[in-house]
């Protein structure tokens, strides 16, 4: 009797298992919205700045385990890799960084790892060189702050798709689909930004910040950009630079100037006092905001949230 009962239970168990497998298969492939996942587990990816990490997450989706070295408020110009950072880079299957010497103090590490066979990609490599801006001061390299011209930053998606696909060919179709979706989202974001900027008359579109991170922003959305420091925060501004900026503010009757989340605000506060102009708010320049911090329905810890926060802050302060 016990033997018959055991066989019956076994048959029921096998039947239940088959039903579970059938349901799982339908759930995974029934919609046809994305290709089936490979069996290799999540691809381990390490990225540098918050903007690059966001880009990797957009393209990689649930097939990638992405970790960023830099968080909110971190200045990549001055960032030096710690021992734990190097360990994380060594443990990654793919490394993405922004490039154009934004992470200047880490360049040697990237080059050594690439020579050692590690998959290392500068996401800005897929941006045409003739689209890059060069500072008037005769800097030997282009302005690295390309993420503020949304259509330009969207071209970086191609490098991310390629880098992930090279490491995990079985998921290439998945990464390609997500890359195209990310480009569409950025095209929509750019159109929103253009319309938001147009709420300001051209004569009021003067953006004054701590360092020269917004030239691409100015080109894309019609702002004259004036900064106290150059494209890198490594070189500090002198007294003559501050006096010149104060004169410019007074002459042009600028209504507000702005501090940056990744740059100490002391000099801009001093300019504000000397010129008698208000500080219009804090902009995200070299890093996004804190993930999960919501503002007007968008997450400040995302690329979309960064762009929308900056446009809203600037337009509202200069109206």
Predicted region positions:
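Bacterial N-terminal signal peptides that target proteins for export
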Residues: 1-14
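Extracytoplasmic metal-acquisition and chelation regions
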Residues: 12, 26-319
């Amino acid at each position: 009797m016990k033997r018959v009962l055991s066989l019956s239970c076994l048959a029921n168990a096998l039947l239940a298992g088959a039903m579970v497998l059938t349901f799982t298969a339908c759930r995974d492939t029934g919609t046809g919205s994305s290709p089936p996942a490979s069996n290799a587990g999540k691809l381990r990816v390490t990225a540098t700045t918050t903007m690059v990490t966001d880009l990797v997450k957009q393209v990689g989706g649930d097939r990638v385990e992405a970790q960023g070295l830099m968080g909110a408020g971190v200045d990549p110009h001055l960032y030096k890799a710690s021992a734990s950072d190097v360990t994380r880079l060594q443990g990654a299957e793919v490394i993405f960084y922004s490039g154009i010497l934004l992470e200047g103090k880490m360049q040697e590490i990237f080059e050594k790892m690439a020579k050692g066979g590690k998959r290392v990609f500068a996401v800005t490599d897929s941006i045409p060189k003739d689209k890059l801006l060069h500072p008037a001061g005769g800097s030997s390299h282009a302005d690295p702050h390309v993420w503020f011209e949304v259509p330009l930053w969207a071209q970086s998606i191609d490098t991310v798709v390629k880098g992930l696909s090279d490491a995990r060919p079985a998921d290439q179709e998945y990464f390609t689909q997500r890359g195209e979706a990310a480009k569409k989202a950025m095209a929509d974001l750019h159109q929103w930004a253009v319309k938001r900027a147009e709420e300001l008359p051209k004569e009021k579109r003067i953006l004054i910040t701590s360092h020269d991170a917004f030239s691409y922003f100015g080109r894309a959305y019609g702002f004259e950009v004036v900064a106290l420091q150059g494209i890198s925060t490594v070189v500090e501004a002198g007294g003559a630079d501050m006096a010149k900026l104060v004169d410019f503010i007074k002459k042009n009757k600028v209504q507000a100037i702005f501090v940056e989340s990744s740059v100490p605000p002391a000099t801009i506060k001093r300019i504000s006092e000397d010129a008698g102009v208000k500080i219009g708010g804090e902009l995200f320049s070299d890093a996004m905001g804190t993930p999960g911090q919501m503002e007007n329905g968008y997450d400040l810890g995302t690329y979309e949230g960064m762009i929308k926060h900056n446009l809203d802050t600037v337009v509202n302060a200069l109206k």
